[in-house]
Amino acid sequence: MAFLWLVSCFALVGATFGCGVPAIQPVLTGLSRIVNGEDAIPGSWPWQVSLQDRTGFHFCGGSLISENWVVTAAHCGVKTTDVVVAGEFDQGSDEENVQVLKIAQVFKNPKFNSFTVRNDITLLKLATPAQFSETVSAVCLPTVDDDFPAGTLCATTGWGKTKYNALKTPDKLQQAALPIVSEAKCKESWGSKITDVMICAGASGVSSCMGDSGGPLVCQKDGVWTLAGIVSWGSGFCSTSTPAVYARVTALMPWVQEILEAN
């Protein structure tokens, strides 16, 4: 009976689709265009979305933060003619029950600077809400005060290139576990390009790469997956010994809250 209760208890947790708790648990090696990553378990990163143009070309990733909102990188240059695809795992398959969602409004952070890549965040308001399910749900947003110290093991996901010179991106969603890198250590690679609105991770034999942009860097906090970073920029060769750079979500939360409350 105890086992039955446990199962129904887990079913209940899944049914509410709270943020940061996948109904299908991810399995990460080392926790477990991601270089040296691995295929994810289908549906285990339910907030991951693919941003596609009208031809169906995947150009960036993003994360669902609610039924109505997606967060991505400003440098992705999303337009209202693009679509958000939720619930996808294998982009080469027609068998998946995906949701193709139109974008009503694009809110690019007005302080985004394409030269310094500071404030690399855009919010997308969906024209119709995503239907939350076992394979589609939201990631938790951090508070301004949340801290993700150096060494924290986090995860990044995406359909980006698995080698910098690969001709195409992988069909199946890739994942990698990687540590947060201190600002001082990151500056050893990138110098003054690193600012307080960025957070670094990797240099551990894995890397984000072209096509992963806009996607999530998530860390577990109090048992839920929380969005610590948005894939922003890094080595042109997707070097696995150089940290990749992510927009620091905690530093951008005041702007996020302002947009969500006003809309």
UniProtKB/Swiss-Prot annotation:
Disulfide bonds join 19-140, 60-76, 154-219, 186-200, 209-238. Keywords: Digestion, Disulfide bond, Hydrolase, Phosphoprotein, Protease, Secreted, Serine protease, Signal, Zymogen. The keyword Chloroplast does not apply. Residues 1-18 form the signal peptide. The active site is at residues 75, 120, 213. CDD domains: Tryp_SPc. Its EC number is 3.4.21.1. GO terms for cellular component: extracellular region. SMART domains: Tryp_SPc (SM00020). The modification Phosphoserine is found at residue 93. It is found in: Secreted, Extracellular space. It comes from the Eukaryota. It catalyses: Preferential cleavage: Tyr-|-Xaa, Trp-|-Xaa, Phe-|-Xaa, Leu-|-Xaa. PANTHER family: CHYMOTRYPSIN-RELATED (PTHR24250), CHYMOTRYPSINOGEN B (PTHR24250:SF65). Belongs to the peptidase S1 family. This is Chymotrypsinogen B. It comes from Mus musculus. The lineage of its organism: Eukaryota, Metazoa, Chordata, Craniata, Vertebrata. The gene is Ctrb1.
